[in-house]
Regions:
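Short acidic/polar alpha-helix capping motifs at helix-coil junctions
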Residues: 5-10, 70-74
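Transmembrane helix-loop-helix hairpins at the membrane interface
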Residues: 19-24, 33-139
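Short, Lys/Arg-rich, polar N-terminal cytosolic tail immediately upstream
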Residues: 1-2
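Hydrophobic core of alpha-helical transmembrane segments in multi-pass integral membrane proteins
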Residues: 7-26
C-alpha cells in the first residue's frame, strides 16, 4: 500500500469509528441482541456483498457513463451513494440513515481513487463490525 493510500485509508478508518460514536449519541439506539450467525451475516457477509454490488458493479458502470467530478466525489459515487442510502432507508431508524451518507461517499471515493473494491470492502467491514458489536442486531 502506497503511503498516500495508507494515510487516506487510516483516516477513513478513524472516520468510521467517529461515525459509530455519533450514532451512539442519538436517542434511537437499538437494544443489543447478540446472536452469532445473524451477526456474521450482517457484520461480515453483507458488507462484502454490498461493496461488490454497489462499488464493483453499479459505481463502475455509472463511472463509465458519467465522467463528472464534484471535487473528489464523482457523479457515479453520488448516484451509487443515493441508491445505497435508499436501500438502508427502510432498514434503519431514520435519524441514522443520514449517517450512512458519509461512509458511503468515502467507500465510493476509495473505489474511484484506487480503481479497486478492496478498500471499500475493508472499510465497510470495519464499519459494520463496529456497529453490530456496539449496538447489537436489529430487533
Amino acid at each position: 500500500m502506497k503511503r498516500r493510500h495508507a494515510i487516506e485509508f487510516t483516516l477513513a478508518c478513524a472516520a468510521s469509528v467517529m461515525f459509530i460514536g455519533a450514532m451512539a449519541l442519538l436517542d434511537e439506539v437499538p437494544t443489543p441482541r447478540y446472536v452469532f450467525w445473524p451477526w456474521v451475516w450482517l457484520a461480515l457477509i453483507t458488507p462484502v456483498l454490498e461493496a461488490l454490488c454497489f462499488r464493483g458493479l453499479v459505481q463502475t458502470e455509472l463511472r463509465q457513463r458519467f465522467d463528472r467530478q464534484f471535487g473528489p466525489i464523482s457523479a457515479a459515487n453520488l448516484l451509487t451513494s443515493a441508491a445505497f442510502v435508499a436501500l438502508h432507508w427502510a432498514q434503519n431508524p431514520k435519524a441514522w440513515v443520514g449517517l450512512v451518507v458519509i461512509p458511503s461517499l468515502v467507500y465510493g471515493y476509495f473505489r474511484d481513487r484506487y480503481d479497486s473494491v478492496k478498500s471499500p470492502i475493508a472499510l465497510h467491514l470495519l464499519h459494520n463490525m463496529l456497529y453490530f458489536s456496539l449496538f447489537g442486531l436489529p430487533p
